[in-house]
């Protein structure tokens, strides 16, 4: 396996200007050679059609694999221990598995995300949202109208508490889960900090699993524990990774969805008015948010199984590949006025939850959380408005997900 030519661009590990970066990269085409943290080269897929082609299921003749054994740099020893993205590629579970093993692992967790199970979670999510809004009201009254960070107080707590309820996370472990999930997405922190927080997260997951073995409940973790060993793939190691993946996939990305939808509506008051008047659906807002502000950012990692041509680029066997879901959502070859937020547009196509074999299993849960949280927020606070110039609100750290570092707002008038 050989590595392709040196990268033309450096992928900013802080992710501070993701949209500007995408436009600079796109000048070189839909497939761009970049340098990841630590100097490791990779391709970034920016084109919608190229991403769909790359992510197609090809059981007999795959172009790419999730198996790190196909990465030339890793096999050659050029990836140091502690490299910040390594944890996205080496853990044994759904995220890194190829068919047919991926199907077995996906089927293990799938019962937690059936329409009936998701429907049963609806009242739990409604209560979580109502409680967060009450906490915000109390905090706002105590702060005498000062600026509130809606991301910290609402956008992120709703999904992490929902995931906690789904998995049965004990209260005493919730803080460790939160810090560990944050570390996985922050590509700007030091490797030592990332490893420490990630290690603490894995330890907390093991503790939770041990408790469920001793005293199972009515949650996803308990269901997985009860079926350990029923298939060769259903091992304790894979169970731990399935729990970790559920936390990772369901936490910050869903928080970013709520964050970006609020930001989009507050910066496009004409569309907010249309939603409030019932002229535009919350489903349309959510789909357009997922296209306009892809919440998954640059998702690592896939590896070329063989040499192939895509989007004018010559991919070599062993090359690493990231998919820019922000870039695919703003592909001008696919979307008219791609940079415009417009929930009335005719097409709702987006790759916000991926495509193909690894399409997000928890997508219906994420959509439900947003559909509960957004109308409840705007109904409770009809005077909600941004407290800073939108252009000065920074992005969240790292290039893996796409949200804001903070979402400063004035809550305005409260509706009882």
Label for each model-derived stretch:
Residues 1-416:
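Cytochrome P450
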